[in-house]
């Protein structure tokens, strides 16, 4: 089995996983194109957990692609938490990403960073949390973990 870091990567342990309850799963995927987001959406659709929440951040250079990416998760993700990729001057801000998610009829909220986003959405309810939209965002998550 081949595993590519940052592509449908299940986080089983570490600081980020420790912030969550035991029944919450954490997945990272650096999908930053329409095609790669379709693959992630297909994978998430197969998972038997109904409550799926996304943490989304992307670069400004992918702005046109961002709307197409979000569209692929309609009916899959119940909520989107938008974040600006830390220490990345070319990152879209969370406000604009939230507006984009709202235009696609997602429940959407902004967050300052990944840790803040996880605090906002972690509950005792069984769920899958997927951090996606940029390899930079996934890299940031991995460095924090």
Walk through the language-model features, giving the residues of each:
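Short, active-site-adjacent cap segments at secondary-structure transitions
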Residues: 137-139
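Active-site-proximal loop/hinge segments that shape catalytic or ion-binding/gating pockets
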Residues: 134
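C-terminal helical cap/extension that packs against the catalytic core
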Residues: 21-27, 70-128
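Short amphipathic alpha-helical segments
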Residues: 39-41, 67-68, 94-95, 142-145
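Nucleotide phosphate-binding/pyrophosphate-handling subdomain across enzymes
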Residues: 1-79
């Amino acid at each position: 089995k081949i595993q590519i870091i940052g592509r449908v990567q299940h986080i089983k342990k570490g600081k980020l996983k420790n912030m969550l309850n035991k029944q919450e799963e954490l997945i990272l995927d650096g999908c930053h194109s329409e095609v790669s987001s379709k693959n992630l959406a297909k994978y998430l659709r197969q998972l038997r957990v109904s409550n799926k929440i996304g943490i989304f951040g992307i670069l400004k250079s992918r702005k046109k692609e961002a709307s197409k990416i979000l569209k692929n998760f309609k009916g899959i993700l119940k909520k989107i938490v938008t974040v600006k990729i830390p220490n990345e001057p070319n990152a879209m801000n969370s406000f604009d990403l939230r507006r984009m998610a709202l235009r696609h009829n997602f429940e959407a909220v902004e967050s300052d960073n990944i840790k803040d986003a996880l605090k906002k959405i972690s509950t005792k309810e069984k769920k899958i949390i997927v951090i996606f939209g940029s390899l930079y965002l996934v890299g940031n998550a991995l460095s924090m973990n």
